[in-house]
Amino acid sequence: MARAVHRSGLVALGIATALMASCAFAAKDVVVAVGSNFTTLDPYDANDTLSQAVAKSFYQGLFGLDKEMKLKNVLAESYTVSDDGITYTVKLREGIKFQDGTDFNAVAVKANLDRASDPANHLKRYNLYKNIAKTEAIDPTTVKITLKQPFSAFINILAHPATAMISPTALEKYGKEIGFHPVGTGPYELDTWNQTDFVKVKKFAGYWQPGLPKLDSITWRPVADNNTRAAMLQTGEAQFAFPIPYEQATLLEKNKNIELMASPSIMQRYISMNVTQKPFDNPKVREALNYAINRPALVKVAFAGYATPATGVVPPSIAYAQSYKPWPYDPVKARELLKEAGYPNGFSTTLWSSHNHSTAQKVLQFTQQQLAQVGIKAQVTAMDAGQRAAEVEGKGQKESGVRMFYTGWSASTGEADWALSPLFASQNWPPTLFNTAFYSNKQVDDFLAQALKTNDPAEKTRLYKAAQDIIWQESPWIPLVVEKLVSAHSKNLTGFWIMPDTGFSFEDADLQ
């Protein structure tokens, strides 16, 4: 009898031990529910922030940005810039290896920047690197990068999520297929990519930072439906979800096991007006439309309070951003200006959106109603990614059907050049970049170009302010709001958060 009890005790102990081991393993596996799918795992060939964010599982850059969008060293220890602003010399950390065992060194950096700056590779992020004349490996830990002309924002380009260090061995092995075979220096390596369902990454045992990563795996799971994404948190199917639909935020906030986070962002939402087309070529019309929109009401109706009215064309947390007195809501003034512009009865136009999710739909409906109150009839269209690529990003000024266009921009370099030049410089009309207002002002172009030729912060401040002053006065946009980024996570998950550019930070994430 005693023997039988002893055996059952051993069995019970074995079961308990197995369960404990199983739970311990499961406790280190995190599922992240995200709003859309991934296009590629090659950061240099991804136009979407989400793909670049997931690629941070595998990849690191020479530099990065912290939560305040300030520059930090990652694979680099330091850098210097020549007096003429042409040459950047970067000192690298020693003793780091890629996940395939290849040494990380100056030769590896050269291989990556040579690839990125070669137009023959047709990489989507080529515009970031087109100013590189040559990259030289001076010794194993020293890289010299020579530019074609001074470009004072270049160090921020090296901190952009696209500027990832890929194993040169893997680049040679996989070539154009590298987007399916990521090999970097990051804390995780690829486990599985089911292209219709999820990306799973696992701990890289040879990671160069001691004690990291703390998780065994992360599964990135695209969940397009807002309600399903929120429900996965409540059932425990996911430990982190982003974005959280504004209408679900209050419900999740009441759940004692979930923490809701509303983080600052650099995501500015705006409506561009095609200034090469009537009636938007008339400054009074553009001014009228800015008076016609009640931004505080828009914050409540479309964003459930998780946004702030825009105070400029560059979000406040971006370096060299200028703030102005927000446009007041004044429909009477709007009608007066329309009358002065020759449109006493208003006019008809189109209003397109770059996205078709629920928040974009609400913005379109709200704006349509606001414009109707001053006599403007707007036919609205919420586009999917394919429509946007074909009708907006892929057509030049003569072919473009863009009139009013609701969209957003996140300057992931954290610096004013990438917040201004792609959106307002004359050379950046579609299909080159994203100046969907087809705005052109020689003074603005000159100020932006001059700002890139100086490393003097005071001079850069003066030049960027001058450019923003003109843009604000000429109003090719209706600046709307700067979003707050709403995410939610299980309370036992720590160290996992959203960056201001909508990317993720998770290097020291852990489950308690």
Swiss-Prot record:
Which PROSITE patterns does the annotation name? SBP_BACTERIAL_5
Q: What does this protein do?
A: Part of the ABC transporter complex GsiABCD involved in glutathione import. Binds glutathione.
The record's subcellular location field reads: Periplasm
Entries under InterPro entries matching the protein:
Peptide/Ni-bd, SBP_5, SBP_5_CS, SBP_5_dom
Describe its assembly: The complex is composed of two ATP-binding proteins (GsiA), two transmembrane proteins (GsiC and GsiD) and a solute-binding protein (GsiB).
The protein's name is Glutathione-binding protein GsiB
Any one GO MF term held by the record is:
peptide transmembrane transporter activity
Gene3D superfamilies for the chain:
Dipeptide-binding Protein, Domain 1, Dipeptide-binding Protein, Domain 3, Periplasmic binding protein-like II
PANTHER family in UniProt: GLUTATHIONE-BINDING PROTEIN GSIB (PTHR30290:SF32), PERIPLASMIC BINDING COMPONENT OF ABC TRANSPORTER (PTHR30290)
Its organism's taxonomic lineage begins at: Bacteria, Pseudomonadati, Pseudomonadota, Gammaproteobacteria, Enterobacterales
CDD domains the record matches: PBP2_Ylib_like
Q: Where would one find the signal peptide in this protein?
A: 1-26
A Pfam family that this protein carries is: SBP_bac_5
For this UniProt record, give its keywords in alphabetical order, as a comma-separated list.
Periplasm, Signal, Transport
Gene designation: gsiB
From its record, what is one biological process in GO terms?
A: dipeptide transport
* Protein family (similarity comment): Belongs to the bacterial solute-binding protein 5 family.
**One GO term describing the cellular component:** outer membrane-bounded periplasmic space
